[in-house]
């Protein structure tokens, strides 16, 4: 027996009289007509009286309407696999050769001229396909560029990680070399410093590993997105256009490009290489340095008002000028005096007792700096000083002067000179086991440097207390020595 109905014509016979769509969960009324379950539910909810069949107008009871199982099976059998839409217009039986840009659906020529799409922007399917193909190619190109950027970022992270580890290895060697000179007295401190360094390095490497893992994850997602999008390019025209926008958006959203730019992590250890020993000295109550001869003051440089005593280790400003030869090395205006020993290399530490003086200055001066007239107290003139003014203001003499936030009133000032490193550091040395930094000058030292003391004017006796270069003391105190 031959079939007289085509599939589209059969679909017309399988439309619900209410929604005019193919039946969904069809129910059969007592009169024999069928309707979608949702259509009957909606219709019965809006009626105050009993329901009548929309086709034959017979009164029916929806609550006793059974499912039309046979009709449902016929509909399921006619439905295409994967629920793929047809390529022929269901209304006009013409090929779906156009695409409505507003409604985002395929239409035929008559739909665009006479149907609901006649005032919409329509484009040939081939044109839409070409346009979307170009968009896909552009997105793939962008993903490839992002992929290259991520690869470059990963390379920088790997190099940064390697550099951190190498610098850590170098610094670890420096620590071991320094601690070998301290022998058994610093074994415990060496273990502590190495542990701190390793922890610092682990933290930096862990941070870089985390960034590396994130970047590699992004790289993998970009590669997957790139592969999925490239596969879309092999689909048929209709399949490609139908799934392009949704699939492309989903894949690209899951593969967001790496945010930010590469920012390298610098290896900055808590200890400066040159200060390892100094830090250990603080912890070991300054017992590790030998005690060479202490500094002495040079009378030939002292201002005429200055009086030296106790083997040229104590100086104070007197009321009357002393009769002294006016020689080039002597200060004739500023109340200053130099130590007899200067330094042109190495690392050195000494202390000065300032007691309760209300005004004082100390530091180092170039041997060639002028000592005649008012002293130019600035690094530009070869003078590096800190001091106390009127018992209240601590300051570093730079350009301009810099007030120093000093806690309390230190009676003993430590001075640490690292000639090659170009560092001059001042400490509050009141407590033997705790050197608190007051200020550090950074400079390119040239020529011999001499410790300098400036007692400042006696102010009619109110500032007449002495400044003292303390002699070598027992194991509880640091003494002058070359590091």
Swiss-Prot record:
Residues 127-169, 203-236 form a coiled coil. One of its GO terms (biological process) is regulation of establishment of protein localization. Zn(2+) binds at residues 89, 92, 111, 117. This is E3 ubiquitin-protein ligase TRIM50. The modification N6-acetyllysine is found at residue 372. It comes from the Eukaryota. Auto-ubiquitinated. CDD domains: RING-HC_TRIM50_like_C-IV, SPRY_PRY_TRIM50. Expressed in the stomach. Can form dimers and trimers. Interacts with several E2 ubiquitin-conjugating enzymes, including UBE2L6, UBE2E1, UBE2E3. No interaction with UBE2H. Interacts with BECN1. Interacts with SQSTM1. Interacts with NLRP3. The keyword Ubl conjugation applies. It is found in: Cytoplasm. It catalyses: S-ubiquitinyl-[E2 ubiquitin-conjugating enzyme]-L-cysteine + [acceptor protein]-L-lysine = [E2 ubiquitin-conjugating enzyme]-L-cysteine + N(6)-ubiquitinyl-[acceptor protein]-L-lysine. Keywords: Acetylation, Coiled coil, Cytoplasm, Metal-binding, Transferase, Ubl conjugation, Ubl conjugation pathway, Zinc, Zinc-finger. GO terms for cellular component: aggresome; cytoplasm. InterPro entries: B30.2/SPRY (IPR001870), B30.2/SPRY_sf (IPR043136), Butyrophylin_SPRY (IPR003879), ConA-like_dom_sf (IPR013320), PRY (IPR006574), SPRY_dom (IPR003877), TRIM/RBCC (IPR050143), Znf-RING_euk (IPR027370). Residues 275-474 form the B30.2/SPRY domain. It comes from Mus musculus (Mouse). Its EC number is 2.3.2.27. E3 ubiquitin-protein ligase that ubiquitinates Beclin-1/BECN1 in a 'Lys-63'-dependent manner enhancing its binding to ULK1. In turn, promotes starvation-induced autophagy activation. Also interacts with p62/SQSTM1 protein and thereby induces the formation and the autophagy clearance of aggresome-associated polyubiquitinated proteins through HDAC6 interaction. Also promotes NLRP3 inflammasome activation by directly inducing NLRP3 oligomerization independent of its E3 ligase function. The gene is Trim50.
């Amino acid at each position: 027996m031959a079939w007289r109905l085509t599939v589209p014509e059969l679909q017309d016979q399988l439309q619900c009289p209410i929604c005019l769509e193919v039946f969904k969960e069809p129910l059969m009324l007592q009169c024999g007509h069928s309707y979608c379950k949702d259509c009957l539910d909606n219709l019965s909810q809006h009626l105050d009286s009993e329901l009548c069949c929309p086709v034959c107008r017979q009164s029916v009871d929806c609550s006793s309407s059974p499912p039309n199982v046979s009709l449902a099976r016929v509909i399921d059998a006619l439905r295409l696999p994967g629920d793929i839409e047809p390529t022929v217009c269901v209304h006009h039986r013409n090929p779906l050769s156009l695409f409505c840009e507003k409604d985002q659906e395929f239409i035929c020529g008559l739909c665009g001229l006479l149907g609901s799409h006649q005032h919409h922007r329509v484009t040939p399917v081939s044109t839409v396909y070409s346009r979307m193909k170009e968009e896909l190619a552009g997105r793939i190109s962008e993903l490839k560029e992002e992929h290259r950027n991520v690869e470059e970022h990963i390379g920088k992270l790997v190099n940064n990680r390697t550099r951190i580890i190498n610098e850590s290895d170098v610094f670890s060697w420096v620590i071991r070399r320094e601690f070998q000179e301290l022998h058994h007295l610093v074994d415990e401190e060496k273990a502590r410093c190495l542990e701190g360094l390793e922890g610092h390095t682990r933290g930096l490497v862990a941070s870089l590993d985390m960034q590396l893992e994130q970047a590699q994850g992004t790289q993998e997602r970009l590669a997957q997105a790139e592969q999925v999008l490239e596969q879309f390019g092999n689909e048929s025209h209709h399949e490609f256009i139908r799934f392009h926008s949704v699939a492309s958006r989903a894949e690209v959203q899951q593969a967001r490009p790496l945010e930010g730019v590469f920012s390298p992590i610098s290896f900055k250890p808590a200890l400066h290489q040159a200060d390892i020993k100094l830090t250990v000295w603080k912890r070991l109550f300054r017992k590790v340095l030998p005690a060479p001869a202490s500094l002495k003051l040079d009378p030939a440089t002292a201002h005429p008002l200055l009086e030296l005593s106790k083997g040229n280790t104590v100086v104070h400003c007197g009321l009357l000028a002393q009769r002294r030869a006016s020689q080039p090395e002597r200060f004739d205006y500023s109340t200053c005096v130099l130590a007899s020993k200067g330094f042109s290399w190495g690392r050195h530490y000494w202390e000065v007792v300032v007691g309760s003086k209300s005004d004082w200055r100390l530091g180092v001066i170039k041997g060639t700096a002028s000592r005649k007239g008012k002293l130019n107290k600035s690094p530009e003139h070869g003078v590096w000083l800190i001091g106390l003014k009127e018992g209240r203001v601590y300051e570093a003499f730079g350009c301009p002067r810099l007030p120093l936030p000093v806690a309390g009133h230190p009676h003993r000032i430590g001075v640490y000179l690292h000639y090659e490193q170009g560092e001059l550091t001042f400490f509050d040395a009141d407590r033997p086991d705790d050197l608190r930094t007051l200020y550090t000058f950074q400079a390119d030292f040239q020529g011999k440097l001499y410790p300098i003391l400036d007692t400042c004017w006696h102010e009619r006796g109110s500032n007449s207390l002495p400044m003292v270069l303390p002699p070598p003391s027992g194991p509880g105190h640091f003494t002058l020595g070359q590091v």
